[in-house]
Amino acid sequence: MTRKESELEGVTLLGNQGTNYLFEYAPEVLESFPNKHVNRDYFVKFNCPEFTSLCPKTGQPDFATIYISYIPDEKMVESKSLKLYLFSFRNHGDFHEDCMNIIMNDLIELMDPRYIEVWGKFTPRGGISIDPYTNYGRPGTKYEKMAEHRMMNHDMYPETIDNR
């Protein structure tokens, strides 16, 4: 089932050899395309092992692997635009928790997914790692209940956490 050119009109970055890498937070770079399988639930997961942002107080770099999982509805995020968007955090100064919530909010605004979760596993600084997790399920649907369940059971058993 090949996509029609009209379905890809909003996808401008994929295959573009003149990619402009932005060094400041740029949510406008995010692009979406239509989901051809709206009749079923399925997860899309992105693993982004090279996320970088800056500490808002010291300006020191913070490094993380970011996991973004979502159940799409009508729209899906285009992966190259997501890569460029995440790269735009390179010189953005914010706390880890804020970065994960900003990412989730921007993706909700772009796609209006049924469900989404964003998990950042930051490398230690000062001997402590921070792993913020945030999620969202569309209000009034089974996905809202799913979000509540996943949040209440997230990292419930520390002995089974293997993220380092």
Swiss-Prot record:
InterPro entries: GTP-CH-I_C/QueF, NADPH_dep_7-cyano-7-deazaG_red, QueF, QueF_type1. Pathway: tRNA modification; tRNA-queuosine biosynthesis. Its EC number is 1.7.1.13. This is NADPH-dependent 7-cyano-7-deazaguanine reductase. HAMAP family: QueF_type1. Its main location: cytoplasm. The keyword Cytoplasm applies. It catalyses: 7-aminomethyl-7-carbaguanine + 2 NADP(+) = 7-cyano-7-deazaguanine + 2 NADPH + 3 H(+). Substrate binds at V77, E78, S79, H96, E97. The active site is at C55, D62. The lineage of its organism: Bacteria, Bacillati, Bacillota, Bacilli, Bacillales.
